[in-house]
Amino acid sequence: MAVAMMVDNPEGTQEAYDAIRAHLGLQKPAGGIFHVAGPSPNGGWRVIEVWESEQEADTFFRERFIPTLRTLGLAGPPPPREFWPVHNAMQ
């Protein structure tokens, strides 16, 4: 079942996001359906994604995202991820 995920990182910046994206590359990860990011209305940086499953999002997070943060020296505790089931999505 597809899931949506949101991360609001109050410490996030466009510069950090751009560095992470450059390191990860622009290829869609396995299980990734949709990705959007920008300044959070609460300050910091917000990412919203749709994944084929929460397990695929977790695999990407564990195997690629966290190692990228460490490589770039951004290895504080990651902000919490919020998941919910997707009933409908338009592309």
Where are these regions (language model features)?
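Short S/T/G/P-rich N-terminal loop/turn motif that feeds into the first structured element of a domain
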Residues: M1-E63, G73-Q91
